């Protein structure tokens, strides 16, 4: 048992393990919790406990994910681990478990494998900002030169996907050996390597900006007219803070408009300010009810712009998940549900990709019929006749 209760005053960071199947992601997750539990900073979670991940539904997509939590001297971490490759793909694309950074696990005995590459690419596409590497199974490699060769390969692979390969911290060790030591009740030479890894994670992955510190953005859910007071726009504040007197822009669907906030209320009570996570009504000066509609966003002026054409990384639901039963081709025209509204758009598949089958993940180019407030990392659902057939994230804005 942990000796003390979790201390919530430490900065909180979300991380996860990524990498090829059987390279030791789950063993490492168990080893981290085991080694830190000896320091009273975590509760020991067994491998089986993590590997039998409960299935969760995120926008109708079934994802198996394990969540563990632990602390280092400096931080509190929430850590996600997925049992299967498909679960990782779905997790990263839907943002079910947002990651501020990732630990890439590569077997020193095998070197980078296809899913190593795919997880690095996905991290780049979906905006996982920082990666630290653990070269696992070091106990199976007698040749120091081989270890250095694998390290070089990993650095080159990271650089190929625009991560700073040369500056990425890489720690070698053995998750299994560290776990065995910790179960015997001590932090030995292998446990020290896990602590070294966590020290690198502490130092290299920055503490994320809190949602309230970001620029203000609120998707519009509904619009009302209040006699004598003007137009009220309601929604849940996605990020930032809004207060009376703030200038805001209304972006999306039509030409961008500027206005001033004259009131912020929650449950009919006046608030000094609304902040990320609050469901509020925002009163706008001189704005007519018919000028605002669901699907637009209120935001800090200049912080987000409307776009029609973008590239996205998508996961297409399988038939079992309630998705399509048949593939789709270029020029497929579904609805793209962004934040609070559906907008029709047409899909262009990459060169050399004839069609996309249910259960696949692919990069697509989308052209919407009307502009929507978009930025890198904006999540969307793909819908057809009201049912979700895919999920995606904006990876590049074209126009």
UniProtKB/Swiss-Prot annotation:
Look up and give the organism this protein is from.
Answer: Helicobacter pylori (strain Shi470)
Q: Where is this region: G3?
A: 81-84
- List GO molecular-function terms, semicolon-separated: GTP binding; GTPase activity; translation elongation factor activity
- The name this protein carries in UniProt is Elongation factor Tu
- Where is this protein localized, as stated in its record? Cytoplasm
Q: Which residues form the tr-type G domain?
A: 10-209
Q: Which lineage? A: Bacteria, Pseudomonadati, Campylobacterota, Epsilonproteobacteria, Campylobacterales
State the residue spans of region: G4: 136-139
Q: Which GO terms describe its cellular component?
A: cytosol
Q: Known Gene3D superfamilies for this protein?
A: P-loop containing nucleotide triphosphate hydrolases, Translation factors
- Residues engaged in binding Mg(2+): 26
């Amino acid at each position: 048992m942990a000796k003390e209760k979790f201390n919530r005053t430490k900065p909180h960071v979300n991380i996860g393990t990524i990498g090829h199947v059987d390279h030791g992601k789950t063993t490492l997750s168990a080893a981290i919790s085991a080694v830190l539990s000896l320091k009273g900073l975590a509760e020991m979670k067994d491998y089986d406990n993590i590997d039998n991940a409960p299935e969760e539904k995120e926008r109708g997509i079934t994802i198996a994910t394990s969540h563990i939590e632990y602390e280092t001297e400096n931080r509190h971490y929430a850590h996600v681990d997925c049992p299967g490759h498909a679960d990782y793909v779905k997790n990263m694309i839907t943002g079910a478990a947002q990651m501020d950074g990732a630990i890439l696990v590569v077997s020193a005995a095998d070197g980078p494998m296809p899913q190593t590459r795919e997880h690095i690419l996905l991290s780049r596409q979906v905006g996982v900002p920082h990666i630290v590497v653990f070269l696992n199974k070091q106990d199976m490699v007698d040749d120091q030169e081989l270890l250095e060769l694998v390290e070089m390969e990993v650095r080159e692979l990271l650089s190929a996907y625009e991560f700073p390969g040369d500056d990425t911290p890489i720690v070698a060790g053995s998750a299994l050996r560290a776990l065995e030591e910790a179960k015997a009740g001590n932090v030995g030479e292998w446990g020290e390597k896990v602590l070294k890894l966590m020290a690198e994670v502490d130092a290299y992955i920055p503490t994320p900006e809190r949602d309230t510190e970001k620029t203000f953005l609120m998707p519009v859910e509904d619009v009302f007219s209040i006699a004598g007071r003007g137009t009220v726009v309601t929604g849940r504040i996605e990020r930032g803070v809004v207060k009376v007197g703030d200038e805001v822009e209304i972006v999306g669907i039509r030409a961008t408009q500027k206005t001033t906030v004259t009131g912020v209320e929650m449950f009919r009570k006046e608030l000094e300010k609304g902040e990320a996570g609050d469901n509020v009504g925002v009163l706008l000066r001189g704005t007519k009810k018919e000028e605002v509609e669901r699907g637009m966003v209120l935001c800090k002026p200049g912080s987000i712009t409307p776009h029609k054409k973008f590239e996205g990384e998508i996961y297409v639901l399988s038939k079992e998940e309630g998705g399509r039963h048949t593939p789709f081709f270029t020029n497929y025209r579904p609805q793209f549900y962004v934040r609070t509204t559906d907008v029709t758009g047409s899909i262009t598949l990459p060169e050399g990709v004839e069609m996309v089958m249910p259960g696949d993940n692919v990069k697509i180019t989308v052209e919407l019929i009307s502009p929507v407030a978009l930025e890198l990392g904006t999540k969307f659902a793909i819908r057809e006749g009201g049912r979700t057939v895919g999920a995606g994230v904006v990876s590049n804005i074209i126009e």
